[in-house]
């Protein structure tokens, strides 16, 4: 690398400068405090783990997302985490081994081999919660409620959450009795919402009239809560698992309407992100101007099986940097106290007192001429009579 290029960072790798870093860190603290107020215990998983445990239950996508490195001590392959959720599952199943409910929360960097979208970071900061040990719908409702309060605490503007259930698709495909290859084609068409291609595929692959009607309708069952009633009528003769999944979505909608009457909810029965990972309710949060979700979550039972302890689980993870940037790029207002002479008799005790009370106190160094604004100071410490007092900078 040429000397002139040594300041360059790899594509998608970003640094965070003081003003934004302060805002992001303040948001991180606020959200972790919120999680803990709901009973979630804060954990700090490692940045790297052996690849086998890091990718447990995550599927091929996670494998492709993960940087691999060789451990110089054991010779084994390690991975730099691309998701903290599997780590939390390992900690619940093996490290903690708590009986009953276990609520965990976290905040930390993850790293992707490729960005998730145009101009997206490969080193986002992920914050989230995981609730282990409860298979009932109450757990899913708690996690979705906490996501809504997370976004509210972050001060996000107009946004909505998208809610689905992989149980609908899974039960219909099983009932259809098609091959794995046929399912893969339908799955891709469904995710692309390619109605014409779906119609052609159904005509060529599905002979049962009722099943054809169901598979053709699935991509159109997206919108407000009215689509749940439509789906219930349409799938009246479908496998019981389909009706059970729709019942769960109706219950979630009812509770969220009561708790958060102004929240915007969008239901999509063909939304299958993380299909091979999630096992029930899935959801995401979207904000105007961003193509990708700023938070994703859902139920992912049985992930702990590989660690010898299968546990029901649900949770969500959010992109802290994206949330921070959506809320605005305001610069920090000066709020510090500038000390021009930190060697004055008796001044150090006053400086310590101010810092202990939470004030930002910046002491000038010999020959320092930087303006006050570069130190984020709007006040200064001066001596009046026998006392040191804080005065505004004019």
From Swiss-Prot:
This is ATP phosphoribosyltransferase regulatory subunit. One of its GO terms (molecular function) is histidine-tRNA ligase activity. GO terms for biological process: histidyl-tRNA aminoacylation; L-histidine biosynthetic process. Pfam families: tRNA-synt_His. This function is generally fulfilled by the C-terminal part of HisG, which is missing in some bacteria such as this one. GO terms for cellular component: cytoplasm. Belongs to the class-II aminoacyl-tRNA synthetase family. HisZ subfamily. Heteromultimer composed of HisG and HisZ subunits. It comes from Saccharophagus degradans (strain 2-40 / ATCC 43961 / DSM 17024).
């Amino acid at each position: 690398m040429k000397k002139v290029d040594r300041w360059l960072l790899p594509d998608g790798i970003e640094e965070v400068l003081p003003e934004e870093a302060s805002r992001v860190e303040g948001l991180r603290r606020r959200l972790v405090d919120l999680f803990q107020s709901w009973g979630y215990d804060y954990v700090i998983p490692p940045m790297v783990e052996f690849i086998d445990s890091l990718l447990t239950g995550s599927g091929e996508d996670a494998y492709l997302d993960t940087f691999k490195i060789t451990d110089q001590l054991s010779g084994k392959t390690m991975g730099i985490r691309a998701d903290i959720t599997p780590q939390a599952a390992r900690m619940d199943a093996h490290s903690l081994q708590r009986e009953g409910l276990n609520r965990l929360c976290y905040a930390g960097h993850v790293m992707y081999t490729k960005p998730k979208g145009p101009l997206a970071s490969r080193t986002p900061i992920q914050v989230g919660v995981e609730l282990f040990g409860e298979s009932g719908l109450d757990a899913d409702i708690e996690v979705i409620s906490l996501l809504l309060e997370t976004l509210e605490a972050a001060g996000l503007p107009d946004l909505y959450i998208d809610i689905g259930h992989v149980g609908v698709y899974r039960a219909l495909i099983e009932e259809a009795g098609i091959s794995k290859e046929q399912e893969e084609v339908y799955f891709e068409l469904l995710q692309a919402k390619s109605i014409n291609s779906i119609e052609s595929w159904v005509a060529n692959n599905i002979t049962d009239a009722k099943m054809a009607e169901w598979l053709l309708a699935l991509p159109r069952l997206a919108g407000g809560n009215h689509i749940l009633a439509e789906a219930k009528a349409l799938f009246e003769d479908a496998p019981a698992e389909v009706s059970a999944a729709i019942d769960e979505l109706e219950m979630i909608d009812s509770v969220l309407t009561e708790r958060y009457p102004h929240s915007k909810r969008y239901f999509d029965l063909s939304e299958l992100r993380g299909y091979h990972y999630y096992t029930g309710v899935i959801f995401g949060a979207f904000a105007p101007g961003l193509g990708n979700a700023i938070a994703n979550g859902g139920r992912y039972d049985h992930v702990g099986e590989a660690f010898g302890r299968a546990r029901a689980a649900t949770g969500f993870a959010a992109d802290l940097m994206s949330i921070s940037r959506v809320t605005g790029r305001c610069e920090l207002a000066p709020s510090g106290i500038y000390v021009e002479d930190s060697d004055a008799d008796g001044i150090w005790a006053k400086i310590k007192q101010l810092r202990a009370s939470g004030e930002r106190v910046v002491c000038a160094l010999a020959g320092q001429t930087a303006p006050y604004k570069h130190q984020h100071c709007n006040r200064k410490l001066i001596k009046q009579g026998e006392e040191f007092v804080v005065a505004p900078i004019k």
